[in-house]
C-alpha cells in the first residue's frame, strides 16, 4: 500500500505530492521487523533528504519564475578561513540587501548555501526574489569578490 502526503503552496496553485510505503508491507503473515537503530550513514542520508525536501518546499512557496539565482565568490585576498567567517560576510551583505528592499517597500525572501569548491575556495549560492533591480542591489552588497548570475 502506498501512502501519499499532499502539500499545497501559493494558495493552492502548486501541489507537492510525497509518496511512501506505509511500513506494513511484506509477505503475508509476516510481522513487522524489530526497530533497528539507524547507522550514522543512514541518518546522514535521511537528514540530507529532509533538508532537500524543506528547501524544495520553501522554494515552491516563496519563489516564482524570474527570481534570481546568484553565486557570490571571493577574490583570493578576501577568502575566509572557515565557514563561520563566510557566514559573517553573508550576514553583513544581507543587512544591506534588507535595507535596500525595505526602502523600496518590499520584503526580501532568500535561501542560501555556503560551500567550499573543489579547489578550496568558499562561495555562497543565493536565491532571492526579484523586485526589478535586485541584481544591482546584490551586486552592490557583495564587496568581497564577484557576483555571478545563473
List the predicted regions and their residue ranges.
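Positively charged, glycine-rich low-complexity segments
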Residues: 1-122, 129-150
Amino acid at each position: 500500500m502506498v501512502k501519499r502526503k499532499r502539500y499545497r503552496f501559493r494558495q493552492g496553485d502548486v501541489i507537492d505530492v510525497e509518496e511512501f510505503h506505509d511500513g506494513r508491507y511484506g509477505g503475508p503473515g509476516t510481522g513487522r521487523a524489530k526497530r533497528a537503530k539507524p547507522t550514522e550513514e543512514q541518518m546522514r542520508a535521511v537528514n540530507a533528504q529532509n533538508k532537500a525536501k524543506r528547501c524544495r518546499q520553501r522554494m515552491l512557496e516563496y519563489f516564482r519564475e524570474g527570481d534570481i539565482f546568484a553565486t557570490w565568490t571571493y577574490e583570493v585576498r578576501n577568502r575566509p578561513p572557515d565557514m563561520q567567517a563566510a557566514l559573517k560576510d553573508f550576514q553583513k551583505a544581507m543587512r544591506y540587501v534588507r535595507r535596500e528592499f525595505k526602502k523600496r517597500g518590499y520584503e526580501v525572501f532568500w535561501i542560501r548555501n555556503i560551500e567550499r569548491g573543489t579547489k578550496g575556495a568558499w562561495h555562497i549560492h543565493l536565491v532571492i526574489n526579484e523586485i526589478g533591480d535586485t541584481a544591482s542591489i546584490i551586486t552592490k552588497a557583495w564587496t568581497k569578490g564577484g557576483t555571478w548570475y545563473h
